Amino acid sequence: MLDINALKEIPPATAVGAAVAVGALYFFCQCFYNLYLHPLRKIPGPKLAAIGPYLEFYHEVLRDGQYLWEIEKMHQKYGPIVRVNAREVHVKDTSYYNTIYTAGARKTNKDPATVGAFDVPTATAATVDHDLHRARRGYLNPYFSKRAVAGLEPTIHERITKLLSRFDQHRKDDQVLSLDGAFSALTADVITARFYGEHKDYLDVPDFHFVVRDGFQGLSRVYHLGRFLPSVVGALKGLPKFLIRIIFPPIAELLTMREEIEAGGIDEFTKSKSSGIKSSVLVGALSDPHIPPQERTVARMLDEGTVFLFAGTETTSRTLGITMFYLLSNPDILNKLREELKSLPPSDDNMHSLGQLENLPYLTGVVHEGLRLSFGPISRSSRVATHEALQYKEHTIPAGTPVSQSTYFVHTDTEIFPDPWEFKPERWIKAAEDGVALKKYITNFSQGSRQCIGYSMSFAEMFLTLSRIIPAFDLELYDTTKADIDMTHARIVGYPKKVPGKTESLGELRVKVIKKL
């Protein structure tokens, strides 16, 4: 029988020593198992990665999103398949992408390790289980179909008109314009119009610093910490906000944004119930009596709203900004695009339908090159084949193993995209003429059964926005170089390092509006 009194007599130093010894033994056993007994022991890769999450933690958390480039070095040394941590395999082979991100009947879960940092457990995008994800996506699909997006075109055009008025005001005032901020405000207004049924006038914010943009930037800074230590981030969230702002400001920004989403959602829900109008995703999908009650809770509304605003704001706005950088850096490309846009029938304020614009080959090439070189989310989003092993060449990947491939490697594959770091709209025109389906290699929105639900809306925003800005204004880059877009940190999406002398830590694209055209 255990003698409690005897335990009390153990000297503290002895107790600490015993605890350290037990911890060391556990660590040694875990490392031994992962290296020599684990089902992935035959997959190539560095032993330091195989023993646990330690190498990844160092490069992602302590070095701020650097593991992507370490994985690139692993592939250079070990080949196209590597074990990037104790439990996950990464494949750098574009031809294998659709095997990982499949659209077939194979049950494919999301890796739980990739969703915890977002703290949106009931959102469709964070749903781990294959069947539950399919059901939740089915509730939302009608609101993001091509037909639904076509119905949103007047709203997008109205917001672009507001954006152009901000451009013109900066021209009159001879002020420098933040393209990052302007495009973030535009895309945030569009997605809030879709989600809530009305936009939130973020384009009216004088400096374009609004709560959604600041909230996403806050999330990007804590994303990797949240993946590895979700309890630490959760504990910080429980503190008073004034204290959080002192200890860790990014979490305060994130909490402020979620509070606004919740308040806006409840307000819209209340108005819609009294009017009977179902004009938004929130009201239409999440109050549908055909949807199970547990799927129509306030908590789920908040989770879905958070993801919609993040995904619908930052990725599209960064793509627009990077596309504009390349256009303004390459006058020949810019002039070719202007000439093509002149071929469109005359219209008020250069407003044309998405259908008209998608028939323009050079604009289509510009949009796809912008998508390719902005990458979208580049952090690994692993998939898990739950019931069957996958085969990659001579390597068998056991069922239940998280497997990933980053968009970064697909979009810079020299066999698919020669001169991958060059902005070449012509490559898309030539591919179309040669019957090459190059578009299938654009993976910003992922592919398969978990492809981003908002991809049609993002395309619409890009086509419509570029088609109206380019003919309307002569813009000039201001104190902005390629260092402002070169990706050096993988935090959900890719960000450049902070440029000395700039105020923004996540990149800053600035222009002068020279004249109206």
From Swiss-Prot:
Question: Which residue ranges run through the membrane?
Answer: 15-37
Where mainly located? membrane
* Disruption of the gene: reported phenotype: Impairs the production of harzianum A and leads to the production of a larger quantity of the aspinolides B and C, as well as other secondary metabolites including additional aspinolides and their degradation products, gamma-lactones, and hemi-ketals.
For the protein in the UniProt heading, the enzyme class is oxidoreductase
Phosphoprotein as a keyword of this entry, yes or no, is: no
Q: Does the keyword Transmembrane helix apply?
A: yes
Q: Do you know which InterPro entries this protein is assigned to?
A: Cyt_P450, Cyt_P450_CS, Cyt_P450_E_grp-I, Cyt_P450_sf, Cytochrome_P450_monoxygenase
Record key words, sorted: Glycoprotein, Heme, Iron, Membrane, Metal-binding, Monooxygenase, Oxidoreductase, Transmembrane, Transmembrane helix
Q: Name one GO cellular component term.
A: membrane
Domain of life of the organism encoding this protein: Eukaryota
- Membrane disposition: Single-pass membrane protein
Briefly describe its induction.
Answer: Expression is positively regulated by the cluster-specific transcription factor TRI6.
Which cofactor does this sequence's record say it needs?
A: heme
What residues bear carbohydrate chains?
N444
Query: What is this protein's function?
Result: Cytochrome P450 monooxygenase; part of the gene cluster that mediates the production of the antimicrobial trichothecene harzianum A (HA) that plays a role in Botrytis cinerea antagonistic activity and plant defense priming. The biosynthesis of harzianum A begins with the cyclization of farnesyl diphosphate to trichodiene and is catalyzed by the trichodiene synthase TRI5. Trichodiene undergoes a series of oxygenations catalyzed by the cytochrome P450 monooxygenase TRI4.
Family, similarity comment? Belongs to the cytochrome P450 family.
Q: What is this protein called?
A: Cytochrome P450 monooxygenase TRI4
